[in-house]
Amino acid sequence: MDKTVIFAVAGSGKTYRIVERLDEVRRVLIVTYTEANRDNLRTRIIQKFGYFPANIVLYTYFTFLHSFCYRPFLLSEKRTKGVTYARSSEKGPKFGLDDDRRYMTKGRWLYHHRLAKYVEQTDTVKDVIARIEKYFDAFFVDEVQDFAGHDFNLLMALCRSEVECMFVGDFFQHTYDTSRDGAVNINLHADYEKYKARFKAAKMELDLASLIKSRRCSKSVCDFITEQIGIRIESHSDALTDVRLVEDHAVAQDLYQSPKIVKLFLQEHYKYGCYSQNWGASKGLDHYEDVCVVLHPAALDAWKAGALATLNPETRNKLYVACSRARGNLTFVPDAFLKQHKRKQAK
């Protein structure tokens, strides 16, 4: 069976690649991390077929982990109530790997960041693999770069299934982790070469060539990302668009008021009362034309110094995500120009 991981760039057609492989006969399991990308995939599938075919199953990751990997095999025995996104206490008692109390609260809610390990520890992985092989012909994973901690280890185990496996992602769009648990895979995303080696070790073929050009971003935006943010990306198009920093207060207010131009903030976009999103949360969103990226002071200083590539990796990756949402013009605005609109408390 084919086992492939495709390393792509923003806007290169990751979603299209998945959807083009679908038909109305082959049974396909699709897993992605964020709800936004789940919704985007669902929309694209319906656009292709006019409806959502019954032979295709689409999950967000933690729904897949709990309802597909855990419930059929362990729920009746363990009598758990669901999944909690609260973390286990660092100050509480330490339980061993074979102690159920390590994986759930006193009220029997499963810790999300240890659920994949629980599936492994209970020797359930082989059952999950058998279930995938029984019900599906192919297993596709989108946003693979966000799998971390025990979740990444589980994913590497599941790719041993005797079905086609295709994982798609962009290493530099790693802005969130599915979960973290102590030092488990803590340096997974610290080195691109070592990251790729993990997939090779799982006997997956690496595709580094088929999705290297963005179909979304103009040459101007791609050149800016490559030269200033330090992440290589090319454009399928020779189109030129504006990439600029606004330093005029009145112009910034016009951008703020515009219902057609999304404002992307590092965080707390909801406090500004405009058409907006956060940098990282804009990942998977493909419907913006012109984009306004709001720069906090450290990012503004780096922009002016030509040093955006030196931002800490998490911030740099989120900035890359934000900039690569633009199909048209890419405008930067200092957040100082928009502070007057920020609510002290979200309503």
Regions found by a protein language model. Name each.
Residues M1-K347:
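The feature marks helicase ATPase cores and/or their adjacent C-terminal helical subdomains
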